[in-house]
A protein has these predicted regions:
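Sec-dependent N-terminal signal peptides of Gram-positive bacterial secreted proteins and lipoproteins
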Residues: 2-26, 418-436
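Domain-terminus/edge residues, biased toward the C-terminal soluble/receptor-binding domains
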Residues: 199-200, 211-216, 220-423, 430-450, ...
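Active-site-adjacent loops and short helices of periplasmic peptidoglycan-processing enzymes
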Residues: 4, 16, 26-220, 224-233, ...
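Periplasmic/cell-envelope proteins involved in peptidoglycan metabolism and beta-lactam response
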Residues: 2, 10, 191-194, 437-443
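Long, low-complexity, intrinsically disordered segments
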Residues: 456-466
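Generic "edge-of-domain/loop-turn" microfeature
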Residues: 6, 18, 23, 92, ...
Length: 466
């Protein structure tokens, strides 16, 4: 009986395991390479210096796989110190380089790019931003702020400059309260906007990027957000300002002046004339994060680096050189295989390495008119189009085939459930039958023993009577 129970339990456990692995997936834990993972002593027993440990972590980060390197004929990208990174073509959304690009990481102050986007789309530059007591709670020691006072007022233009250049946390909070009506509603607006942009691994808990374990982005999502944000001329104007001064206010009698913090935009060691916008970030939990927009010969790219201990600017330059030197934009309308589509913009293009040909790409036209091009599953361009008249019948058949395939995929989990349940029921039925057979055998054995005992008693009685 116990064996039967154990068997039932094993079958049920196996069924549950199959359901968990085949149908559902666990939430991804946000993890980084940590000092705890590094051996603290050398082979001869000496304790390692902090610099040595940091160097080993950086080497491990460099060795993390780059997804795009696995693509056939794709030019291999540079090693970077960041645990995640991406290079996206701003003209068409093509992914030129991707390293852990869909993993979740803490963004720190690059969050403020989304804050700026939502603010610009839902306010006027002349709107008044008033600082509440709650907003001043962000003025922690060690965190960026510009010492705003309770009930102090500035306009939205001043506030956006303070947030994007000085990275002022209390200003980001006050912008959220002003635009959203409540701070909580503004954060909700940020998350809704992220979904509209196609972000799948992003969730915001605040407007300034201060650490929260439920506040995260992926490199791909951050590139999508930046691409949209930097399409706003007002934000580009702010980002390209080297120095800004907020005049005296209703409370402060002195001007506040601050400078651009992105070191590729100011004269110095890391200055790069190709850089036309970006945002820095850092917390103890996120390490260094950096977003940079670059332009060369009319081509624009956005570079995102997450979870980096060091060398973010050197890595950004290396990724920019890699992208501009090894990739080219191909106009879609000039390609023979694109003739099945109509109403494509003359400027629409894909971006691919010089060793990859357009004929090797796969295309997908979505119902909303979005035309996407892929190379071995990697996105290389997005535009809008319609199916040409002579291909509409073919397209309808393809759409029906895709819908049928989708329906099969949707019903597959339920089929698996029914199969597993059927297996469980069969096993249980067999166990019941086996237990019944075993019980019948025991009853038969008991009857045999009882008859044997009766015969022995009868024999004993006969002997006694004789």
């Amino acid at each position: 009986m116990r064996k039967g129970i154990r068997l039932i339990a094993s079958v049920l456990a196996g069924a549950i395991f199959m359901l968990n692995t085949g149908i559902t997936s666990c939430a991804e834990e946000i993890t980084y390479l940590l000092e705890e993972d590094i051996e603290k002593t050398t082979a001869d027993g000496k304790e390692k210096e902090p610099k040595e440990i940091k160097k080993e972590i950086i080497e491990k980060a460099k060795a993390l796989p780059v997804e795009t390197d696995a693509l056939k004929n794709w030019t291999k990208g540079p090693e970077i110190c960041g645990e995640a990174g991406i290079v996206m073509d701003m003209d068409n959304g093509a992914i030129l380089y991707g390293k852990s690009m869909d993993r979740k990481y803490y963004p720190a102050s690059i969050t403020k790019i989304m804050t700026a986007l939502v603010a610009l789309e839902n306010s006027q530059m002349t709107d008044t931003v008033t600082f509440s007591e709650q907003s001043l709670g962000c003025q922690h020691s060690g965190y960026a702020h510009i010492a705003m006072k309770k009930d102090e007022q500035i306009n939205m233009r001043d506030a956006l400059h303070a947030m994007m250049l000085a990275s002022a946390n209390e200003v980001a909070y006050a912008i959220g309260e002003t635009v959203g009506g409540t701070y909580e509603h503004f954060v909700q607006m940020m998350n809704e906007r992220a979904k509209e942009l196609g972000c799948e691994n992003t969730h915001f808990m605040n407007a300034n990027g201060m650490f929260d374990e439920n506040h995260y982005v992926s490199a791909r999502d951050m590139a999508l957000i930046t691409r949209e944000a930097f399409s706003k001329s007002e934000l580009l104007e702010i980002m390209q300002t080297p120095q800004y001064t907020i005049p005296v206010t209703n409370i402060a009698q002195e001007e506040r002046t601050f400078q651009q913090k992105h070191r590729m935009m100011v004269q110095g060691k890391y200055y790069d004339p190709r850089c036309f916008g970006g945002k820095t970030g850092y917390t103890d939990q996120s390490y260094n994060t950096l977003v940079t927009a670059m332009e060369e010969n009319g081509r624009k790219i956005v570079i995102v680096i997450l979870g980096s201990r060091d060398h973010t600017y050197e890595d950004t330059k290396a990724l920019a050189d890699y992208a501009f030197q090894n990739f080219e934009q191909i106009k879609i309308t000039e390609q023979e295989t694109a003739k099945k589509y109509s109403e494509i913009s003359e400027t629409a293009c894909v971006t691919i390495p010089k060793d990859v040909e357009f004929k090797d790409l796969e295309s997908e036209l979505k119902p909303n008119g979005e035309l996407r091009y892929f190379y071995e599953g990697n996105l290389v361009g997005v535009t809008t189009a319609k199916l040409a008249a002579e291909h509409k019948i073919e397209g309808a058949a393809l759409k029906a085939e895709q819908q049928e395939k989708k329906a099969k995929q949707e019903t597959k989990p339920w089929k698996m459930i029914w199969i597993i349940l059927a297996i469980v029921l069969i096993v249980i039925s067999l166990l019941v039958i086996l237990l019944q057979i075993r019980a019948a055998k025991k009853r038969k054995e008991r009857m045999r023993r009882r008859r044997a005992m009766q015969r022995r008693r009868q024999q004993q009685l006969r002997k006694r009577d004789s």
